Amino acid sequence: QLRAIGLAPGDAVMIHAALRSAGQILGGPDALIDALHDVLGPGGTILVYTDWSDDYHDLLDDDGTVPAELRDDIPPFDPAASRARRANGAIAELVRTRPGARRSANPGASCAAVGGRAGWFTADHALDYGYGEHSPFAKLVQVRGKVLMLGAPLDAMSLLHHAEHLAKIPGKRIVRTEVPILVEGRTVWRRFEEFDT
């Protein structure tokens, strides 16, 4: 069925899946990822939008800053260990934890990938404007990659954030927030900039 919808060896495919809406998949999510690997072959790449489970956003003040007294209680983003955001589904976390998976370093726009070009897709992901020109999303467009929406609604397509970033719209709002990231084994609070989406 995956070949019938146009997937082919060597393709780069970003998948968004809502498994409850997709219906029964024999073998579950692992079987789906294995089937994608079979179709794409060793040169193909599977990508997912992971984001991360950053439950502290309700604590931000109007300036996008976390109160100093709470900082020690908030774990930093670690590309190797931080879970994918739960709202992004089981497939995102499954791909993130697969053997050989790579993950990009931008907390809010992070992607994980497995396959032939996983390292290239996830390398050099800018910390500011994470949906922009040097993102896994831009690289997916560059290689004419595909997006597989499996039971997920169209508004879940993270590639739309890349289009929003590129759109020449006057007065686009810039959001600045502090984010804890792991740098050489210690937590560093860094202010990030992103277009509001």
Q: Which stretches of residues belong to each language-model region?
A:
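N-terminal and secondary-structure boundary signal
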Residues: 1-197
